[in-house]
């Protein structure tokens, strides 16, 4: 397709990344020296702990220049998502988990640096996907996928909702119930008129045998630059490549390639687009630790049904999670991955596919940061730091030494190290909401548990 080839050639000049998983999220980088070199931007992050009984959560929004210069002194706008949902006549959310911007005004060189009009919020405890207008901060659409389209199946576990580059659809990764397979849902999107229509569900249990797992549970995904395919990571390992079909669902989603767990081991996590039709994902070891990997897939042959095995890079540390890309002063591409359990950051040379440096984030002002979802702009990397009592994924790992909030790392020009100081930590601690803590539960601690994060280009 000519449009696809055009995007592929142009993307060789720029960098588009995402993090994510539990976080999947798209993140981007340029070779500039700092975040302020780009157009106006904000940093959005969600605290998935409830604000009303078991529902709600908080959305934090920082001015990009303010949080980059002195995160500790930057004043965020804070939105109670239970109140915002009520004002929009939407159901109260539970565990707001992932925030990802759309791509409404495509820049032919790099759609990730196009102005976004909306942020898409996946709520992993209630089955809701929210559409939030960036300028008004209002929820302008909500789609609940419980039960699936025409009863095809769907649970409350809406893990990630990702907008296509052409703005025509959002695909939702629904993990499914514990011990059961999950689903992919499609929402047709019209951001101009705030019209969001649930049009399709694809049950994934039929692919468990090919994956080599007992169930097929999708975690995160992202689209190829032409919006024709989605690469979907899986909780038990393996990966699905999906032809996404048409935005109205008349041409359904179809799985065109299954990578099994032998080829792609590890708990699936974030997905990121790289230049030259490459897709980057990771395989994590989770709370228990083990082997962790970074993968790069060549998606250039997807339209012709050609799918090579990925490059597999083993990572030191435990529980790879946030993964972004960085371009050094010579134009070389690197991956930067945060290791959630071991608190490390790995720097990977994507020319040689080797880990070239590992650096710990643990410091005297953040003893156990637990870095999770990340995004990058220029040489500023923003990372959500988990709470004392995590509500998702690493709930067994409680610690009083956490600093829930957003870390702002300044990445070196050679993309091989970072610097961060106490002023580079934007706190999301909420003293008004506490939970019992300790062996007896006799003490309390802040309930805050940050997770989703996105750099939003305005």
Model-assigned labels for residue ranges:
Residues 1-8:
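Bacterial N-terminal signal peptides that target proteins for export
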Residues 22-458:
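Predominantly soluble domains enriched in secretory-pathway, periplasmic, or organellar proteins
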Residues 8-15:
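Hydrophobic helical h-region of N-terminal Sec-dependent signal peptides
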Residues 17-20:
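C-terminal motif of bacterial Sec signal peptides marking the signal peptidase cleavage site
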């Amino acid at each position: 397709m000519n449009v696809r080839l055009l995007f592929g050639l142009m993307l060789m000049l720029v960098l588009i990344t995402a993090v994510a998983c539990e976080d999947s999220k798209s993140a981007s980088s340029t070779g500039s020296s700092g975040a302020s070199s780009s157009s106006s931007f904000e940093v959005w992050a969600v605290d998935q702990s409830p604000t009303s009984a078991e529902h709600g959560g908080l959305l934090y929004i920082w001015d990009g220049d303010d949080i980059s210069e002195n995160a500790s002194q930057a004043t965020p706008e804070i939105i109670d998502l239970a109140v915002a949902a009520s004002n929009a006549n939407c159901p109260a959310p539970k565990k707001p988990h992932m925030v990802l911007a759309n791509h409404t005004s495509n820049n032919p060189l790099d759609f990730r640096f196009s102005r976004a009009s909306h942020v898409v919020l996946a709520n992993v405890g209630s089955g809701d996907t929210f559409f939030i207008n960036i300028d008004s901060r209002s929820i302008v659409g909500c789609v609940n996928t419980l039960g699936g389209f025409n009863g095809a199946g769907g649970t409350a576990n809406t893990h990630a909702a990702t907008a296509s580059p052409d703005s025509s659809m959002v695909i939702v990764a629904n993990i499914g119930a514990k011990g059961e397979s999950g689903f992919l849902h499609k929402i047709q999107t019209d951001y101009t008129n705030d019209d969001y229509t649930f049009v399709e569900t694809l049950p994934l249990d039929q692919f468990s045998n090919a994956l080599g797992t007992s169930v097929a549970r999708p975690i995160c995904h992202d689209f190829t630059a032409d919006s024709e395919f989605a690469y979907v990571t899986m909780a038990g390992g393996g990966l699905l490549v999906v032809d996404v079909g048409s935005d109205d669902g008349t041409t359904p989603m179809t799985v065109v390639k299954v990578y099994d767990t032998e080829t792609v081991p590890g708990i699936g996590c974030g997905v990121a687009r790289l230049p030259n039709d490459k897709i980057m994902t990771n395989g994590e070891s989770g709370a228990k630790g083990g082997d962790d990997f970074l993968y790069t897939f060549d998606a250039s042959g997807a339209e012709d049904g050609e799918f090579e095995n990925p490059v597999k890079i083993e990572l030191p540390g435990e529980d790879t999670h946030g993964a972004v890309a960085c371009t050094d002063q010579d134009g070389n591409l690197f991956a930067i991955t945060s290791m959630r359990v071991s608190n490390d950051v790995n720097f990977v040379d994507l020319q040689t596919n080797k880990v070239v440096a590992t650096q710990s984030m643990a410091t005297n002002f953040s003893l156990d940061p637990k870095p999770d979802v990340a995004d990058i702009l220029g040489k500023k990397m923003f990372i959500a730091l988990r709470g004392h009592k995590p509500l998702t994924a690493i709930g067994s790992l409680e610690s009083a030494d956490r600093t829930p909030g957003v870390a702002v790392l300044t990445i070196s020009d050679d993309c091989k190290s970072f610097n961060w100081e106490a002023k580079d930590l934007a706190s999301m601690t909420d003293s008004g909401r506490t939970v019992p803590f300790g062996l007896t539960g006799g003490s309390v601690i802040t309930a805050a548990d940050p997770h989703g994060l996105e750099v939003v280009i305005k």
